[in-house]
Amino acid sequence: DLPDCCYDWMQFSGAWARERYPKTRQLEQGILSVGSMRGNSSHNHNPFVILKRPDTDEFQGEAIGFSLIYSGNFLAQAEVDTYDTTRVLMGIHPSCFDWKLEAGESFQTPEAVMVYTDQGLNHLSQTFHRLYQKRLARGYWRDRERPILINNWEATCFDFTEEKLLEIARTAKETGVELFVLDDGWFGERSNEHAGLGDWFANTKRLPQGITGLSKKIGGIGMKFGLWFEPEMVNKDSDLYRQHPDWIIAAPERRQSHGRFQYVLDFSRKEVVDYIYSMMETLLSDADISYIKWDMNRSITECFSNTLPADRQGEVYHRYILGVYELYERLIGRFPQILFESCASGGGRF
């Protein structure tokens, strides 16, 4: 709560490939808000807002930043009442969310971080950077420089062979690139966007010696090797879907919406997370992989889990995010020196 309303509201909005443009408007009586109901923080709005005095610039003046440490549906809002006082709210979006607590159970909310400065927006930004670099980021890569990488996707899309990939890597090595990343198309029967997601084993028609063989050849060039995954997604034309059609998030007896011809696996279910972990762990154990590009190319729709009763369907969105966090935690614990980079069709998820 703030005792007055003499602030400008700054939000960071946009769309795919043009995320986080600053937009500013003056507070007045009523509510200003941003949020997401897409199952992720979205390309449209970031879970971060600033209240600043009208005369604040980059290097002087008061500002308060609010950042939600969460990857799912969120709401951030500021309300000015009839007395011109301001109340800021930030957390899990209340729409389509509820959580049933049994006796003796507890619920942990996401953390909202608030930073104040009287030295301008640049100081506010630097304070958040230092805080997250030292208190949120962790592990082997926290204080290390990231390698310079090249990714084959824009050069080849799905049309590649092992020799074509090695040619790209050799040329990149000559320019000082340190890491070669193989993007979409290396797994299952993945020759286009319609098939293969969920089958995280090498397509030996393209890669005769699999990922293990390719990673050794990239290492022989003198480069590190990285790999693209989209662990949360599945195509209906895949071994995984044929074996477990009930593993997707979908409302019973309703049309199943797809995005990029793919469906969202129900990560609120432990057996689904366990299965994906097992496939990824096997591959990462066998091959020399230094980097993972973790993608998420569609939003969640028809949010329903087959394993939860009707009175707990409001938990699915949040349980899904907890499942994603669990998979990250298990993989990072098992492979602490792999660099994980989060991609959600670009900048679609915090």
Regions found by a protein language model. Give the residues of each.
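Glycine-rich, aromatic-flanked loop segments that form ligand/cofactor-binding clefts
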Residues: 48-77, 115-140, 148-151, 177-184, ...
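Active-site neighborhood of glycoside hydrolase catalytic domains
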Residues: 203-210, 214-221, 241-350
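Short acidic, Pro/Gly- and aromatic-enriched capping/linker segments at domain boundaries
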Residues: 82-102, 337
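Short Pro-Gly-centered flexible turn/kink motifs
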Residues: 99-118
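Aromatic- and glycine-enriched glycan-recognition loops and surfaces
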Residues: 156-242, 274-278, 319-332
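Polysaccharide-binding surfaces and accessory modules of carbohydrate-active proteins
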Residues: 1-79, 95-97
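Glycine- and acidic
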Residues: 147-156, 162, 197-201, 261-265, ...
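Non-catalytic terminal segments and appended small domains
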Residues: 2-8, 12-15, 25, 189, ...
